[in-house]
From Swiss-Prot:
This is 2,5-diamino-6-ribosylamino-4(3H)-pyrimidinone 5'-phosphate reductase. Signal peptide: none annotated. The lineage of its organism: Eukaryota, Fungi, Dikarya, Ascomycota, Saccharomycotina. It comes from Saccharomyces cerevisiae (strain ATCC 204508 / S288c) (Baker's yeast). The gene is RIB7. Its EC number is 1.1.1.302. NADP(+) binds at T79, D83, V159, G182, A183, N184, V185, I186. The keyword Phosphoprotein does not apply. Catalyzes an early step in riboflavin biosynthesis, the NADPH-dependent reduction of the ribose side chain of 2,5-diamino-6-ribosylamino-4(3H)-pyrimidinone 5'-phosphate, yielding 2,5-diamino-6-ribitylamino-4(3H)-pyrimidinone 5'-phosphate. It catalyses: 2,5-diamino-6-(1-D-ribitylamino)pyrimidin-4(3H)-one 5'-phosphate + NADP(+) = 2,5-diamino-6-(1-D-ribosylamino)pyrimidin-4(3H)-one 5'-phosphate + NADPH + H(+); 2,5-diamino-6-(1-D-ribitylamino)pyrimidin-4(3H)-one 5'-phosphate + NAD(+) = 2,5-diamino-6-(1-D-ribosylamino)pyrimidin-4(3H)-one 5'-phosphate + NADH + H(+).
Length: 244
């Protein structure tokens, strides 16, 4: 499916929130962009595991423009199990070459590359094979898949995000990562101003209701350096997380 042309004013609007090589050369972690689409009532889907369209086609094109500017694209296993996404880039003169490397958080090792949309696109040379994040040696090692073994944080009992991003840069040369979801991943990283460099949120013109899957971090999060863009039906907020 072809993309709607990118709105002419979006590149300039996004410019200050995109990865810059100079910003990551002397750091041990990649440039991290946290980006997602939500409804007016802060829902990212109609319910757990329910694939939901929120964005207008023009902001879907923006998503692929963002993918073009990142080395990796990270999602949780719940998202890939529910949506079976391709996670490739369809924007630009050579989208396949500029597609980000999919990075899948799969600590329970439920997801398989074999038979997935990602594998289909990889075979067609329209996408790249994934890096799967696990907490111990994988039970099954699939062909073309790389594995990042990342410890659990002793305090939170969740993925050690700082260590993971260090591994992605050091072992896989991932210098910029676009985090797309799902809600659990987003809620965790909204609290990490020490890791997240940019926040880009598309807000669709819809309410998804109280049964929807909500983005709501467990504590107050303040933003800074905010900019707004208005489209046909969506608005886009670009910002940075304020320090605690």
């Amino acid at each position: 499916m072809s993309l709607t042309p990118l709105c002419e004013d979006l590149p300039q609007f996004l410019q200050n929130y995109l990865p810059n090589a100079g910003q990551t050369e002397n750091t041990i972690v990649p440039f991290v962009t946290l980006t997602y689409a939500q409804s007016l009532d802060a829902r990212v889907s109609r319910g757990p595991g329910v694939r939901t369209t929120i964005s207008h086609p023009e902001t879907k094109t923006m998503t692929h423009y963002l993918r073009h500017h990142h080395d990796g694209i990270l999602v949780g296993s719940g998202t890939v199990l529910a949506d079976n996404p391709g996670l490739n880039c369809k924007w630009g003169p050579d989208p396949a070459a500029n597609s980000p490397r999919p990075i899948i958080i799969d600590t329970k090792q439920k997801w398989r590359f074999d038979g997935s949309k990602m594998q289909e696109l990889f075979i067609k040379r329209q996408g790249k094979p994934p890096i799967v994040v696990v907490t111990s040696e994988p039970i099954i090692k699939e062909q073309h898949v790389d594995y990042a073994i990342c410890p659990i944080n002793d305090t939170t009992k969740l993925v050690d995000w700082k260590k993971l991003f260090e591994i992605l840069k050091e072992e896989f040369n991932i210098r910029s990562v676009m985090v797309e979801g799902g809600a659990n991943v987003i809620n965790q990283l909204l609290l990490r101003s020490d890791i997240v460099n940019s926040l880009i949120i598309t807000i669709g013109s819809t309410f998804l209701g109280s049964s929807g899957t909500e983005v709501s971090p467990p504590q107050t999060v303040n933003l800074k350096d905010m900019s707004w863009w208005k489209g046909i039906t969506d608005v886009v907020l670009c910002a940075r997380l304020a320090d605690d």
